[in-house]
Structure formats: C-alpha cells, structure tokens
From Swiss-Prot:
Active site: 233, 256
Classification lineage: Eukaryota, Viridiplantae, Streptophyta, Embryophyta, Tracheophyta
Catalytic activity: [(1->4)-alpha-D-galacturonosyl](n) + H2O = alpha-D-galacturonate + [(1->4)-alpha-D-galacturonosyl](n-1)
Glycosylated residue positions: 89, 246, 349, 387
Cysteine disulfide links: 235-252, 364-370, 393-409
Record protein name field: Exopolygalacturonase
Gene (name only): PG9
InterPro entries (alphabetical): Glyco_hydro_28, PbH1, Pectin_lyas_fold, Pectin_lyase_fold/virulence
Segments annotated as PbH1 repeats: 192-218, 219-240, 242-262, 272-293, 337-364
MF terms (GO), sorted A to Z: galacturan 1,4-alpha-galacturonidase activity; polygalacturonase activity
Length: 410
C-alpha cells in the first residue's frame, strides 16, 4: 500500500512539474512580446529596428493586434529611435483600452506604391478610448513627394496619403506628439466624438501643398488646446456636419488660419454649429479666422452659433474673412450664389495687426446674405503705410460695438 502511495505521489509530482514548467515556458513566450504588466508591447521586441532604414511595419502591426486583442489597459511602446513604417491600419473595436506611447520617431515610407488607393499612413478605425501620447514624432516625410501633388492645378486631383486619420473614434486623446511634414493633411478626424487634442505640435513649411494641420468632419465634441501649428494650408479646418468644437490656446502660423470649410462642394453636407475659438494667436497667416463656402454649392446647409473671442493677429493677412464665393486656385466653373447660410457669428476682442488693408471682409451673397454678425471690440490695424485699415462688407447684416471706426460694417 505504501508503495502504491509513493508511486501515486511521484506521478502527482511529475504532473505538477510538467504543468508548472509549461506555464513558465508560456510565460517566456508572452514576455518576449510584453515589456510590462497588463500588456505593454515594445515594438523592438517584435522585430522593429530603430535605424531609420529597416521596414518595421510588421512589428508595429503585430503590436497593435496584440494590444487591441487584450483586455484591460494595453500599451504599445515606440521607444527612442527612428522607425520606418509603411501603411498602418489600426482597426477595432478593441477588447480593452489602448495607449500608443510615442517616445521615438515613426517615419512614413516615401514609396507611394506601398499605400493603397486613397490610402493613408496611419489609419485608426472604430477604436474607443484610444490615447496617442509622448514626445516623439510622426514624420510623414512629405518633402520627398510634394512635387507629385497636382491639387493646385487639377480640381479632381489624386490625393496623397494623410498622416494620422481617425474614423469613428470616440473618447480619444492625442497629446504631446509632433506631427511633421505630412504628405497631405497631418490629422483628419471623421465621425469622431469627444476627442481631446492637447499639447500637440504640427509643423510643415509654409509653402508645402495641402498640409492642413488638423481637419475634422461630421464630428462632435472636439477640443483642441495648447497646440502650435505651422503648415502650408489651414492650421485647423472644420468640415461639414461638425458641432460642439472648442479651440483654445492655439498658435497658428505659417498657414491659412483657422477655417470653417470649405463647405458645399459635395451633396448632402450637414450643418456646422456651436464652434468656439478663444485665446488664440495667428502669426503672419494668409487668413485669420475664416468661413468659406463654394459658390453655387452642391448642398444647402447652415453655419451658425460661431464665436471667436480674444484672438490676437500678428501681421496676418485677411484677419476676419467670410467668403461665400470660395474658389481655390481659380479652378471652379460655377457662377451662382452659394446655398450656404451663415448666421449668428460673433467676433469679440479681436486685436493686433493686419498685413492687408482689409482687416474685415464679409463677402456674402444677395440671395443668401449673412445675418446676425456681431463685431464687439474688433481693433485690428493695417501695419503697412501705403493704405488705410478698412472693412469690406457685402450682403452682411449685424451690429458693431467698440470697434475702430474704419471697421464699422453695420
């Protein structure tokens, strides 16, 4: 009986040893991918090389697959180094909350054949509670391909890849990172809700084509704060169907200013409403704060409840500009009145200098005039000597209080 007990005990210990040993081996396999508790995935442990030359796309995609498939809080670590990657597709929904910690630099491949038709560089789809943070760069390496941009010459041009695209992303955050030299737009949000963009830097030369800083469309609850943007197009552009946007503490320049639009180019565009821009500075921009809609627009929509306050202009051209006959690069063929209604727009405490005599231009149409415009303490003066500060107001109705007498439209 004792022999039988000893044999059973030995067999039990052997089985226990195998189980424990197997768990250790499995743990080793996990640790090869995870650099910390709760699922922290370092791309260098998945084969990424930070030499700026080796293609690390596969490693980054594998990190995403692991993080998105894990429960709880997951982190993808981009450590210091230069990581060359092609098109990245981060698709959800994810089982847990994912943070992408960008301490190093991601470099977009300049080989356009690696991007699918209408493809973007980093495309994030249907992911909630996503955080992209860190002090690293998302470098689109645009200078290598900007010469292939035909959008300044052709109305229906082939669009180069945008850098960071977020579609159907809710309750997300982008903070701390620098977006650099995108091939086209630096950041684009479509049908996103409750997004926070803070402490971000967006940089491209002032003459780089279509390098908008941050664009959004059909989105709501977007906050952009403490952000510095200098690009070759709009610093921030707010597209159709967007509402409840708060922009504060943004410095823009070079660039085309902070814009609503363009609007009316396509059918079935939706209204834009409840947009607040406050405590911002525009430095030597082509425009300051602007609303732009295509002449003879394809959609009937309304822009309303727009509030600009405490905006400082530093030698910006066209500081306040509403353009209902927008036609970029003179490539439009339409010659009719805009179907876009602009109403209830407030400009409060707008100060500084303009590099053009026209500090205010409200260019609305007789068929659909702009109404409810309020000019409250608008004091922007022409910085040149060959002309005087002036306002040009066509088919616009509203009120003026505390403004330079030269800027009294109403």
């Amino acid at each position: 009986m004792a022999c039988t007990d000893n044999a059973m005990r030995a067999l039990f210990l052997l089985v226990l040893f195998c189980i424990v040993h197997g768990e250790k081996e499995e743990s080793k396999g996990i640790d090869a991918k995870a650099s910390g508790p709760g699922g922290s995935f370092d791309i260098t442990k998945l084969g990424a090389s930070g030499n700026g030359k080796t293609d690390s796309t596969k490693a980054v995609q594998e990190a995403w697959a692991s993080a998105c498939g894990g429960t709880g809080k997951q982190t993808i670590l981009i450590p210091k180094g230069d990581f060359l990657v092609g098109q990245l597709n981060f698709t959800g929904p994810c089982k847990g909350d994912v943070t992408i910690q960008v301490d190093g630099n991601l470099l977009a491949t300049t080989d356009l054949s690696q991007y699918k038709e209408h493809g973007n560089w980093i495309e994030i789809l249907r992911v909630d509670n996503l955080v992209i943070t860190g002090k690293g760069n998302l470098d689109g390496q645009g200078p290598a391909v900007w010469s292939k941009n035909s959008c300044t010459k052709k109305y229906d041009c082939k669009i180069l890849p945008n850098s960071l695209v977020m579609d159907f992303v809710n309750n997300g955050e982008v903070s701390g990172v620098t977006l650099l030299n995108s091939k086209f737009f630096h950041m684009n949000m479509y049908q996103c809700k409750n997004m926070l963009i803070k402490d971000v830097t967006v940089t491209a030369p002032g003459d780089s084509p279509n390098t908008d800083g941050i664009h959004m469309g059909d989105s709501s609850g977007i906050t952009i704060t403490n952000t510095v943007i200098g690009v070759g197009d709009d610093c921030i552009s707010i597209g159709p169907g967007t509402s409840k946007v708060n922009i504060t503490g943004v410095t823009c320049g070079p660039g085309h200013g902070i814009s609503i639009g363009s609007l009316g180019r396509y059918k079935d565009e939706k209204d834009v409403t409840d947009i607040n821009v406050k405590d911002c500075t525009l430095k030597k921009t082509m425009f300051g704060v602007r609303i732009k809609a295509y002449e003879d627009a394809a959609s009937v929509l309304t822009v309303s409840k727009i509030h600009y306050e405490n905006i400082k202009m530093e030698d910006s051209a066209n500081p306040i500009f509403i353009d209902m006959k927008y036609c970029p690069n003179k490539l439009c063929t339409a010659n009719g009145a805009s179907k876009v209604t602009v109403k209830d727009v407030t400009f409060k405490n707008i100060t500084g200098t303009s590099s053009t005599p026209e500090a205010i231009s409200l260019l609305c149409t007789a068929k659909v005039p702009c109404t409810g415009a309020t000019m409250d303490d608008v004091n922007v003066e022409y910085s040149g000597t060959n002309n005087k500060t002036m306002a040009i107001c066509t088919n616009a109705k509203g009120s003026t209080k505390g403004c330079l007498k030269e800027l009294a439209c109403f």
